[in-house]
């Protein structure tokens, strides 16, 4: 397992990408989370689309001085292309609400809920969204044996991109007593559901479509598989019976709306092989915008090219009063 670190950066890096345009967009990317590199790659395509759309664009690699830099730059809108801590967890939306700067993507509460796996799990179950059996394990519990019958999944509470996720199978040489809790003092342990990996893109409350992930090399949809070409195939649209496909879209819209999301989101599910039962995994309020990313791919299938997708996201920019 790789260990991806959060990096504390004092000063933001600011670059003017386009000095003229109809509105001034601050494209926020990079930042201090373990998903920094994913965010930077996502921002490359977004910046090109924003310039193509005729916006004045300033790129900001976010540091701890971000409030001061925003006061200096005075953008009309912030395009939140951050992933992980400080950008995806509700921190940046909170700051932008105070500064009264409109921003893309979800607000404080929906971002924080979706990012924290304990609280999102409680929210899902409260709203009758089916999930795999799961428990919270604290480092202080000093558990020596498997906390659940194998196979099971270990998930850090607040990491995206499957960073830190491990699947423990019956044959694995793994002793839970040796697990070092690399991403905080709590983890979620969930029953591993063998089945088909399904992803749904939602934009402004409407599900655009679903695709299936077919693993080619690794045993589960981990960080390496998500961001390495040739490790998985995307089947778009997902080859499902019409009634099941429709149910998937309806469930995704339900999650999006009950969590009061804004702009783009990606809902993730497992379809159990033996029972055809859907299990929700999570909703991601800051889906990737890379060449291999799922939301742009599904949007293209729905007739929305990448540039138009970015324009639709910009249209939702607002702050919470």
Swiss-Prot record:
Residues 121-315 form the ATP-grasp domain. PROSITE patterns: ATP_GRASP, DALA_DALA_LIGASE_1, DALA_DALA_LIGASE_2. Gene3D superfamilies: 3.40.50.20, ATP-grasp fold, A domain, ATP-grasp fold, B domain. Mg(2+) 1 binds at residues 268, 282. Pathway: Cell wall biogenesis; peptidoglycan biosynthesis. GO terms for biological process: cell wall organization; peptidoglycan biosynthetic process; regulation of cell shape. The keyword Magnesium applies. Its cofactor is Mg(2+); Mn(2+). Cell wall formation. This is D-alanine--D-alanine ligase. The lineage of its organism: Bacteria, Pseudomonadati, Pseudomonadota, Alphaproteobacteria, Rickettsiales.
